[in-house]
Curated annotation (Swiss-Prot):
Role description: Promotes alternative splicing of late transcripts by promoting splicing at weak 3' splice sites. Required for the temporal activation of major late pre-mRNA splicing at late times of infection. Induces the splicing and expression of the late capsid vertex protein.
Designated name of the protein: Protein 33K
Organism: Human adenovirus C serotype 2
Renumbered residue ranges of the record's region RS-repeat: 177-197
Record family assignment: Belongs to the adenoviridae splicing factor family.
Gene Ontology biological-process entries: mRNA processing; RNA splicing; viral DNA genome packaging
Subunit-structure text: Homooligomer. Interacts with DBP; this interaction occurs at a unique vertex during genome packaging. Interacts with IVa2; this interaction occurs at a unique vertex during genome packaging and seems to potentiate IVa2 and 33K oligomerization.
Phosphoprotein is among the record's keywords: yes
């Protein structure tokens, strides 16, 4: 007997679940194709960049700078010579070197006007004051020397001369008494008492005795110094 052929049944109609999976598979395939296309385009772009890097770039010609103009320096020969300063007028000296200390004597009208002006100025400054005349210094007092004692102006010349002689003697006694332990006296009069007599006594006899005692005390100090 001949074998029996199996009856092939047609495939069952697709269900909703199968349709869903088929659509998902198609989407996956489409995405893969798109990704492949993207990769191809990236490869082409990278190849184009490599080719552009290998090709030499055209040289750019920069414009050459314009030559600077050098400033022309004028030569020394062409420059004009400096002008000389204008000459100042010569001034005549007022006085000679040997007459600078001398002054011309004022004329009579000028001297009279100066005296009148000085008198008016003095009266304006001291209208009520009286003119005082300075006492003249006697020739005897001037001969006594610069170390004279300055006492009353109305003192007689004789007593002033005695004071001027006593004072240097007292100063010499003071120099001799320095460093001496013992104070010497003449007629119970020491250096201090003689100094008071020289300053305050007004009688000529008293001053004469003071001078004699001062000279005796000075001699005593000198003798003591020679003994030492």
């Amino acid at each position: 007997m001949a074998p029996k052929k199996k009856l092939q049944l047609p495939p069952p109609p697709p269900t909703d679940e199968e349709e869903y999976w088929d659509s998902q598979a198609e989407e996956v395939l489409d995405e893969e194709e798109e990704m492949m296309e993207d990769w191809d385009s990236l490869d082409e772009a990278s190849e184009a960049e490599e080719v552009s890097d290998e090709t030499p770039s055209p040289s750019v010609a920069f414009p050459s700078p314009a030559p600077q103009k050098l400033a022309t320096v004028p030569s020394i020969a062409t420059t004009s010579a400096p002008q000389a300063p204008p000459a100042l007028p010569v001034r005549r000296p007022n006085r000679r070197w040997d007459t600078t200390g001398t002054r011309a004597a004022p004329t009579a009208p000028a001297a009279a006007a100066a005296a009148a002006t000085a008198a008016v100025t003095q009266k304006q400054r001291r209208p009520d004051s009286k003119t005082l005349t300075k006492p003249k210094k006697s020739t005897a007092a001037a001969a006594a020397g610069g170390g004279a004692l300055r006492l009353a102006p109305n003192e007689p010349v004789s007593t002033r001369e005695l004071r001027n002689r006593i004072f240097p003697t007292l100063y010499a006694i003071f120099q001799q008494s320095r460093g001496q332990e013992q104070e010497l006296k003449i007629k119970n009069r020491s250096l201090r008492s003689l100094t008071r007599s020289c300053l305050y006594h007004k009688s000529e006899d008293q001053l004469r005795r003071t001078l004699e005692d001062a000279e005796a005390l000075f001699s005593k100090y000198c003798a003591l110094t020679l003994k030492d």
